[in-house]
Amino acid sequence: MALLSAASTAAMAQDGGSSRFSAEFEIEIANDYTFDSDDPAAELNDTYVTIGAGLSFALAESTSINAGLVFEPILDPADDRFFEDHGLYVEELFLSHDFGGAEVVLGKFNPAFGAAWDLAPGIYGADFAEDYQITEKIGVGINIPITAHGGEHTLSFAMFNADRSLLSNSLGRERGQTNLAAGGVSNTNSPESYSVTVSGNFGATGYNFGVQHQEGGQGDVADQTGVVLGLTHSFDTGSVPWEVLAEVAWFDKFDGTRNSARY
């Protein structure tokens, strides 16, 4: 249950009012309480804060350096806890350049795949859809805007591998630096994994469709492949507009195991 959330934006201007630096912050205080479970050890009360910061600095008119910072619990709760085990880490740090017909992203970023992890409320986003969100990858991405059939669309392609740099660790409660021996899909020597997605809207209806292939790492029995399809539709009912959302995702050899998964 989320208790409090807030978001704010800020910009620093120079050279007669032109803004080169911008920042966006989001703060959420939440409480997760499991009051009954087949496993008594899972009956926990966990209160925590999640703070996200998006920073951008324009090097030129079409070129910028972008960073995403996250402060949140690093460890899963083993007992009741109250604002414990928090750490700060760099989720994204990349250079982007807009060529007009396409944007190129280079560095550490979150490749596009699905949208429910961002759009769905409560546990449907944070606890379910975030299981298949692709985050903290090193590589290159291309985003191509398309205007067609009365709608705005984006075709995205990314090649990547897991981040094993110092940025994979955290400050405060440390999560440790990732290494090849840790295994896990996309944890390879080079960008051998990829995702391809298309998203957009037709009026009040939005959609996203994506495929991914993540190469197995050390100790994994197979490569992971996945497909996602999502739809949204907004209804203007006057003073209280509302939106419906549906997204399904299917994976073969999920997390490099022999198991499939559906969300």
How should each PLM-predicted stretch be described?
Residues 35-38, 122-126, 176-183:
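Extracytoplasmic loops and strand-loop junctions of Gram-negative outer membrane beta-barrel proteins
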Residues 1-20, 60, 123, 148-151:
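Cleavable N-terminal export/targeting peptides
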Residues 50-52, 91-94, 103, 139-141, ...:
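Membrane-embedded beta-strand positions in outer-membrane beta-barrel channels/transporters
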Residues 29-37, 69-75, 99-101, 108-112, ...:
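Transmembrane beta-strands of outer-membrane beta-barrel pores
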Residues 45-165:
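Outer membrane beta-barrel
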Residues 17-20, 152-156, 189-263:
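Detector for outer-membrane/organellar transmembrane beta-barrel domains
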